[in-house]
Amino acid sequence: MFSPVPPCIREQIMKRIPPFDGIRWVAFTHFHEDHFDLDLVNRYLQEAAPEMLVMPEDTQYGVSSKLKAGVCSTEAIELPMGQCRSIRLWETGSLTAFPSRHAGREYEKVSHLCYVLEADGKKVLILGDSDYDSVFFKQMAGAMEFDAVIANPLFLHLPRGRRVFAQSIRTKEIIFCHLPFAEDDQIHFRNMMSEDMKQYCHP
């Protein structure tokens, strides 16, 4: 259903070839295989030696015990719903994590984090595979306005997802991710997204 990172780009990341040469921090929203590959992450930690890895605390998959972090600092975050934790990255940059439910009742026990990246006066909200809960995001976002939100296409396709942006999250831009490449798109996700953008996205 979803596309893996193409091998050529994956190798550029591993070998820190520009534009992937300045990565100092790595963060994961959750550990589903379309977001996280333990072998590739361990290889990257060994070869690129980033400063910090941020991820949910996890008991379902036991990821922490399988990581080969080396000199990389590991922040495994476990918080009650509704709370957040901020990590200072540099003088004008921080990463704030807060737990959210994963979309889909079958995934309700999956450890999942959203992130707010603040850098040089800009704020970006990363939703991962969050549930489409406008009440929850109104509580977490408060009066904040984001410069961009990174969301999966179902936030546009589903009425519940659209309500999150209509009622709860204020943002200048929405960046949609998690789209398969054309050759992998067996369920016509790209066509769905194209039609949704025509219908719901207006200048």
What are these regions (language model features)?
Residues 1, 22-34, 54-57, 125-130, ...:
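Active-site neighborhood of phospho(di)ester-bond hydrolases with catalytic His/Asp-centered motifs
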Residues 21, 48, 93, 144, ...:
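Structured loop/turn residues at beta-strand edges in well-structured enzyme cores
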Residues 31-38, 59-63, 85-88, 105, ...:
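Active-site environment of divalent metal-dependent phosphoester hydrolases
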Residues 1-27, 39-43, 105, 131-144:
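Pre-active-site segment of Zn-dependent metallo-hydrolases
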Residues 13-85:
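Active-site HxH/HxHxD metal-binding segment of metal-dependent hydrolases
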Residues 52, 67-91, 138-140, 163-203:
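Binuclear metal-ion centers of metallo-dependent hydrolases, dominated by the metallo-beta-lactamase
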Residues 39, 101-168:
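Active-site-proximal loop/helix segments of hydrolase catalytic cores
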